[in-house]
Amino acid sequence: MLKKILLILLAIIVVGILGLYLYISSSWNKKYDWPGPALKTSTDSAVIARGKYLVTGPAHCVSCHVSGFADMVAADSGYTVDLKGGVTFQMGPIGSLTTRNLTPDKNSGIGRYSDEQIFRMMRHGIRPDGTASMPLLMPFWNMADEDLVAVVSYLRSLPPVDHKVDDAHYT
């Protein structure tokens, strides 16, 4: 009787794992046709100053989107650092995630994307190509539109840094 229960339990586990695998593989590269918020960046100095405050403070952009640990420490100490990305975080069995270049560089940064694409990424986690990104670690979906505009306006005001970073690697 115990052997029969264990076999049934094992069958349920195998079917569950198979179902999870099929779900993930069928939705992994799914394209989302979800429009970004109809927002536009600003060149107003007060908006950019608000963006700088958010990027270097509550939004924690400088805690990850730097090139290494030394820059993280410098940013946390109040120094200005380039938000050129490149820090790789090991995500255990999921794979690894490398932070993106947030400077307005047209080759490797956000300069190659429209405002709508950036806002959509921040608000909904949808990449410019329409695929889902790794779940965002910061809750930008709750951020007020005015603050989203301020953050991206500040990022657009930074000097561009051409710094190509690795793509995320999923296992």
Task: List the model feature ranges, each with a label.
Residues 26-38, 67-96, 128-171:
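Flexible coil segments in periplasmic/lumen-exposed cytochrome c-class electron-transfer proteins
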